[in-house]
Amino acid sequence: MSESAERKSILDVVGIQELLPHRPPFLLVDRVVEFEAHRRLVALKGVTMNEPFFQGHFPAQPVMPGVLILEALAQAAALLATMSLKPDEVKDKITYLMGIDGARFRRPVVPGDRLELEVEVTKQKGAVWKQTGVARVDGQVVAEAEFMAMLADRER
């Protein structure tokens, strides 16, 4: 998967914003490059010095907060769920994160890194999805966790 620079987008940021409610600066997925319905998805996030969190974490030695790496994985997991269903099944739906287990951080993510976010479905029952997520930079694991999320009706 180190050839991610050459991979074509399956879904760009405009398409992502049609499926996720997140918007900059909290939208943490730039594009989807691999997708197998109900199985797996790979997305990318370019980490730049312009990210607002680097102003305070940490000014002299900027490091992406681990919780935001998990959020990026959770957004990729939400995309996997919504892209796996028919458009009429996800219309007026939103994915809510229900839990995170086994989160581990292996190395810092710094400006200039490109996060590769890989999520896989481990179980799905009705509207509830369980998935594993692994974030990599240059092929090295930087974070991993298990996620549970639910597709629910959007409140109006």
UniProtKB/Swiss-Prot annotation:
EC code(s) of this entry: 4.2.1.59
Chief subcellular location: cytoplasm
Ranges in a coiled coil: none
Active site: 57
Alphabetized Gene3D superfamilies for the sequence: Hotdog Thioesterase
NCBIfam families according to UniProt: fabZ, PRK00006.1
Name the record gives this protein: 3-hydroxyacyl-[acyl-carrier-protein] dehydratase FabZ
